[in-house]
Amino acid sequence: MENMDKRSAWDRFYTESSSTTSSFKNFEWFFGFDSVRDFLMPLLRSSSHPDSPVQVLDMGCGTSALGPSIYRHSPVSVHVTCADISPVAVQLMQEKTRLEAVRPSNPSSRLQFVELDCTQLDRRYSPNSLDLIVDKGTTDALLRSKEGKGKAVLVLQQCFRALQGSGSLLQFSDEDPDARLLWLESAALHHDVGVQEVGQLRGVCYFCYQVTPRTPAKC
């Protein structure tokens, strides 16, 4: 797929994908929720607040069931925003959840789908407003596009602005740590970067890169 940093490419992709089947089916890049459940749930529990929900952004959600699955399975109260640059993908997911309501584990949880260019998170989110940002293949798509590398850095900067001091950015990727860690560490100054192996699927090894704001050293 070419021009993965362009809205028009994704509108075309989701239009064509939805027209090939009579009933809607979620499209998962890499893998689904069950493969990364053990990475997400501990973070949700550790990010929980006594008086407010955990704010979660599924960035570049497409038509994935990841965001709705977080909403469905999280025992703590979450407000999950599934955001994508493609209005076609957003409309498909809105229609899907309208026809098949997703019931949350926590009755105070909320789920929404919004059209949003992730290079412009500041148009929707104030600084220090998100607890968890999930990026499943979105940065990969940008880095593999001819004109997308600069946008990938901008997305990263926007994420850092929106994250709370105790928040986390999770990037799920098939890019080898030798390459991704080098890029993240050079672009994510004042942040800690770690990696864990998710596992292999269809012969491809996937990784979870976690980026968190660095806590200032105490004197």
Predicted regions and their residues:
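N-terminal, positively charged/glycine-rich alpha-helical extensions of SAM-dependent methyltransferases
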Residues: M1-S35
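A short SAM/SAH-binding and catalytic strip from SAM-dependent methyltransferases
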Residues: D131-K149
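Conserved beta-strand signature within the Rossmann-like core of class I S-adenosyl-L-methionine
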Residues: S166-S173
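Class I SAM-dependent methyltransferase SAM/SAH-binding core
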Residues: Q55-L121
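A short glycine-rich, Lys/Arg-flanked "PGG" loop and its adjoining helix->strand segment in the class I
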Residues: K149-G165
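Class I S-adenosyl-L-methionine
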Residues: D178-C219
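A short acidic, Gly/Pro-enriched loop at the edge of an enzyme's catalytic core
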Residues: T119-I133
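Conserved alpha-helix/loop element of class I SAM-dependent methyltransferases that forms part
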Residues: F27-S52, S69
